[in-house]
Amino acid sequence: DRGAHAKGPDGSLADTPDEGAVYRCNPDGTQLEVFARGLRNPQSLAFTENGDLLTGDNDCDKGDEERLVHVVQGGDSGWRVGYQHPLIDKDSPWLADKLWQPRTKDTAAYILSPICNIEDGPSGLTYYPGTGLNDSYRGSLFITHFKGSVAKSGIYTYNVKPKGAGYAIADSKPFLTSALPTDVKFGPDGRLYTSDWADGWPKSKRGRIYAISDPQHAKDALVLETQKLIAQDWTKASVSELTVLLAHADQRVRQEAQFTFAERGASSIAPLTAIVSSPSSKPYARLHALWALGQLAPKNPAALNPLTQLLRDSDSEVRAQSAKLLGD
């Protein structure tokens, strides 16, 4: 959150001298750019199943609170490093104008307010991929809250629901307590893995990694299938197999199918167009087909041809993603 000045191998520049930000580039580092700005010590990033980006950032310890942020292209979440050191006896705009709070009628119009304020010390996060636990966790973000004390720290879940063009929290609750987790991720085996600091402040001399599973779902056929699919050689998958897997219950499998289509180049445009243009295709299959077409577009502009028609699609998410891709 104290700024960055980074160059890509092609000379592209991301320059944010006084704020935390999210950057975007091609897999080879080219076309580096600032995607969103105004964050304070953001910790990790996670995509929802609709392709929206979320993060948690930290407060400045002056009476403000941590935030769950919907990271939007071109968005400004309000933080500047100068707010950490305001003039004596003067509140910075961060505090005086309550820029850290969710939007109200008095919020500055130029910033993208957080979805909500959250527990102290977000240090890592992950989004439930769709397999491994029970269905109550669908749409949930898992955030580790590192507060320096075992008694106060843990993992919380935040169930996010679309609200207009943004998100709202439907529910939040503790998932794991009496631990000092620093990060959290779902493994291909359906278990939730978390790194643990162990002893609190000062610096710990040991650490642990825990694996958490639901015994009622650990051996589900879908969990075992997901583990096998993630480990498979995707280069050998046929077009028909990839088409089916674009609609898989697990987000990671859908992404593998999407990226495999994209890696095959222009030959994928026809099958992807057929998927995304058919109202009978599963909703997630259509979205991942759209994103694969977007990946192909820089070298194959014809990949975007179907998208103009999709701006009038009956599915609002298909319309939204088509507009984003065309705007890029």
Where do the model's predicted regions map?
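Amphipathic alpha-helical scaffolding segments comprising HEAT/armadillo-like alpha-solenoid repeats
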Residues: 236-244, 266-277, 298-311
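Residue-level detector of extended alpha-helical repeat arrays and alpha-solenoid scaffolds
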Residues: 253-254, 283-286, 319
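Outer-membrane beta-barrel transmembrane domain signature of Gram-negative proteins
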Residues: 306-318, 322
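Hydrophobic core positions within HEAT/HEAT-like alpha-solenoid repeats
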Residues: 243, 258, 273, 287-290, ...
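Alpha-helical segment of the N-proximal tetratricopeptide repeat
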Residues: 241-244, 251-264
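Beta-propeller domains with acidic blade repeats across secreted/periplasmic ectodomains
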Residues: 1-241
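Short inter-helical turns and helix N-cap capping residues of alpha-solenoid HEAT/ARM repeat scaffolds
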Residues: 249-250, 280-282, 314-315
